[in-house]
Swiss-Prot record:
Complementarity-determining-2: annotated span: 68-75
Name of the protein in question: Probable non-functional immunoglobulin heavy variable 8-51-1
Single annotated GO MF: antigen binding
InterPro entries associated with the record: Ig-like_dom_sf (IPR036179), Ig-like_fold (IPR013783), Ig_V-set (IPR013106), IgHV (IPR050199)
Species per Swiss-Prot/TrEMBL record: Homo sapiens (Human)
Length: 115
C-alpha cells in the first residue's frame, strides 16, 4: 500500500505542525486512468505555507513526491512522476489538489492525506 501524506512547514519559526486535513478522491482507478485527490485544510494559515506530498510504500521508507509553493505556478515534482503529476491549490478555499495521469503498476495503491 502506498500512503501519501500531506506535509506543510512553518518556515518562519522552523518547526513542524499538524493540520486537520480531510481527503477525498482516491477510489480504485484503472491503469492508464487518472488519479485525482483533494485535501481540505483547516486551522492554519494555509496560503503562506508550501505543501509537500510524501509517499510511503508498504515496508519502505518515505519518498518525496511533490511540492507546491504559496503561488500555484511554483511547483516541483520528483523525476519519476514528472510530466504525469500535477498539483494545484485554492488558497481561498484551503484546498490542495493532486492529479496523476498514465498510472503505472507501481503507482497502484491507496492514497490518503494526513497531517
Amino acid at each position: 500500500m502506498l500512503v501519501c501524506v500531506l506535509l506543510y512547514s512553518f518556515r518562519l519559526f522552523g518547526i513542524q505542525g499538524e493540520a486537520q486535513l480531510t481527503e477525498s478522491g482516491g477510489d480504485l482507478v484503472h491503469l492508464e486512468g487518472p488519479l485525482r485527490l483533494s485535501c481540505a485544510a483547516s486551522w492554519f494559515t494555509f496560503s503562506i505555507y508550501e505543501i509537500h506530498w510524501v509517499c510511503q510504500a508498504s515496508g519502505k521508507g518515505l519518498e518525496w513526491v511533490a511540492v507546491i509553493w504559496r503561488g500555484e505556478s511554483h511547483q516541483y515534482n520528483a523525476d519519476y512522476v514528472r510530466g504525469r503529476l500535477t498539483t494545484s491549490r485554492d488558497n481561498t478555499k484551503y484546498m490542495l489538489y493532486m492529479q496523476m495521469i498514465s498510472l503505472r503498476t507501481q503507482n497502484m495503491a491507496a492514497f490518503n492525506c494526513a497531517g
